[in-house]
């Protein structure tokens, strides 16, 4: 059956035939040979090898299922397609997924799928032929499977693939605005020997005193500032920028996407309306560079470990996190501080005053008579300054009684302690070196007199003899032994036998006088 070329061209325009040809073109990859015969008037074929052209068809377009790329159904409306694109674009955007090396490729595929499916005409052509008319024309004319439109004059193979006419980044900005994503954080300044960008956060070490009282500390940080060479003009010194020829100085360009016409920022001058013929070599025509600056960081009084403050550095913000060193003296609980104060045994019994170190100045505290160990004294308003509120915290002083060691006491003090131990009442348990007598009294077991009740007197007499002091006579000791002393709870008469009745009155009188005589 012979069909002329003109009739064949008309025959190919029928929709049913076009669909069949398109289906045949996207069938299993194959290599088809075409034998070019001699003209009808020659009557015979050439004797040499026949001319053969091979056309390779592939499944590239079938592999790129744009509906599957966006994860939508084939009957999805424009709203669902846009929603799916927005979610996938955020997921695979290079600025938000820097760890995935394939993020850029996936973002490109998502953008391609959205550009086709969001346009009604391109979507209709894609549903019919598997590609758009724009790409068909880019491949050499003709629809898929139609004549020699799929291969060149010299005989070659080619695959059909989508070629976007709009940059994916530009498409994203057009749809969702300029402020959602910053595609390149270094677009408006150039890097330098100091780094690739401005410092956004840093950690500062502080002592406890610096954190408590506040301080101004100088640190060196990277900042983005005006280029020192071109003074922000972006041009080499001695030159000036000219008007952008691509947007005619308007700063905007018109982009046609099928039936829609969109006006966007000029991609050549980035909306500046100017064209820089001789850009500055220092800042690469960007007007700003990364520079090292000394910045004073005001540390607020009462700052805590791990807290972060925000401060303005140039045109950007710097977040400073403080790392406060632990103090060996102060213990912090929010705005309150706790310290320990050591007092002597005599101060604990008789009372007194002691000087303690404060947060801002030293403080004198009063120790009441009979203060026990670990007693807590509060100094109201003497703590740390509150950072997020008015006023100061409190300073709590924990009292600790310093007990002298028996090995470090001299004979006088040891004798006094042992004498007090013999007179002490309501002792929980037993004291080493002090024996309890049957009548309830106590007696020193080491170096004590054989007579009952003479332990304290013997201790005192030995200490007095060692220091050269005079020793009271026996008569005075006997008269002192006959004295009586009164307790708050009970009154007990002490009777001594001979020179060994040296208990005496514990609150005053003979025994106290005898003890004092050791130091006269």
UniProtKB/Swiss-Prot annotation:
Changing residue 478 to K: In strain: bIf and Berkeley. GO terms for cellular component: cytosol; mitochondrial outer membrane; mitochondrion. The keyword 4Fe-4S does not apply. Changing residue 489 to E: In strain: bIf and Berkeley. The keyword Acetylation applies. Ubiquitously expressed throughout embryonic development. In larvae, expression is seen in sensory organs, gopplet cells, gonads, imaginal disks, proventriculus, fat body, hematopoietic organ, midgut, Malpighian tubules and ring gland. The modification N6-acetyllysine is found at residue 106. The modification Omega-N-methylarginine is found at residue 30. PROSITE patterns: DNAJ_1, DNAJ_2, ZF_CR. GO terms for biological process: mitochondrion organization; negative regulation of smoothened signaling pathway; protein folding; response to heat. Residues 430-520 are annotated as: Disordered. CXXCXGXG motif repeats lie at residues 227-234, 244-251, 266-273, 280-287. Zn(2+) 2 binds at residues 244, 247, 266, 269. One of its GO terms (molecular function) is ATP binding. Involved in hh/hedgehog signaling. May act as a tumor suppressor in larval imaginal disks. This is DnaJ homolog l(2)tid, mitochondrial. It comes from Drosophila melanogaster (Fruit fly).
């Amino acid at each position: 059956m012979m069909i002329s070329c003109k009739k064949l061209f008309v025959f190919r325009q029928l929709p049913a035939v076009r669909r069949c040809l398109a289906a045949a073109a996207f069938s299993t990859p194959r290599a088809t040979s075409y034998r070019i015969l001699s003209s009808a008037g020659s009557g015979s074929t050439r004797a040499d090898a026949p001319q053969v052209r091979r056309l390779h068809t592939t499944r590239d377009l079938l592999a790129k299922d744009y509906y599957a790329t966006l994860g939508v159904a084939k009957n999805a409306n424009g709203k669902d397609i846009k929603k799916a694109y927005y979610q996938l674009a955020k997921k695979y955007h290079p600025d938000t997924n820097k760890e995935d090396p394939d993020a850029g490729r996936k973002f490109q595929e998502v953008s391609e799928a959205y550009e086709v499916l969001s346009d009604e005409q391109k979507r209709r052509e894609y549903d019919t032929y598997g590609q758009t008319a724009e790409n068909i024309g880019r491949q050499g004319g003709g629809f898929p499977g139609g004549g020699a439109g799929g291969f060149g004059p010299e005989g070659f193979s080619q695959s059909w693939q989508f070629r976007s006419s709009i940059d994916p980044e530009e498409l994203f900005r057009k749809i969702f605005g300029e402020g959602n994503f910053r595609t390149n954080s270094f677009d408006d300044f150039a890097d330098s020997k100091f780094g690739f960008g401005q410092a956004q956060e840093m950690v500062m070490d502080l002592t406890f005193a610096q954190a408590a009282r506040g301080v101004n500390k100088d640190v060196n940080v990277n900042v983005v500032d005006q280029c020192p060479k071109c003074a922000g003009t972006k041009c080499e010194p001695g030159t000036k920028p000219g008007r952008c020829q691509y947007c005619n100085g308007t700063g905007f360009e018109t982009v046609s996407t099928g039936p829609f016409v969109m006006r966007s920022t000029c991609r050549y001058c980035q909306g500046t309306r100017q064209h820089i013929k001789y850009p500055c070599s220092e800042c690469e025509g960007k007007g700003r560079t990364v520079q090292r600056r000394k910045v004073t960081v005001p540390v607020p009084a009462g700052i805590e470990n791990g807290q972060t403050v925000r401060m303005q550095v140039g045109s950007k913000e710097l977040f400073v996190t403080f790392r406060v060193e632990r103090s060996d003296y102060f213990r912090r609980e929010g705005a309150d501080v706790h310290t320990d104060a050591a007092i002597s045994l005599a101060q604990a019994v008789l009372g007194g005053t002691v000087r303690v170190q404060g947060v801002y100045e030293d403080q004198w505290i009063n120790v009441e008579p009979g203060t026990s160990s670990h007693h807590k004294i509060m100094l109201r308003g003497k703590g740390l300054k509150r950072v997020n509120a008015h006023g100061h915290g409190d300073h709590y002083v924990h009292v600790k009684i310093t007990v002298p060691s028996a090995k470090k006491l001299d004979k006088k003090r040891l004798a006094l302690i042992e004498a007090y131990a013999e007179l002490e009442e309501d002792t929980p348990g037993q004291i080493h070196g002090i024996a309890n007598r049957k009548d309830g009294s106590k007696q020193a077991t080491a170096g004590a007199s054989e007579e009952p009740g003479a332990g304290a007197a013997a201790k005192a007499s030995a200490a007095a003899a060692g220091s050269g002091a005079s020793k009271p006579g026996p008569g005075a000791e006997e008269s002192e032994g006959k004295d009586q002393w009164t307790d708050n709870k009970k009154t007990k008469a002490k009777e001594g036998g001979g020179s060994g009745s040296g208990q005496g009155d514990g609150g005053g009188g003979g025994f106290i006088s005898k003890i004092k005589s050791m130091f006269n």
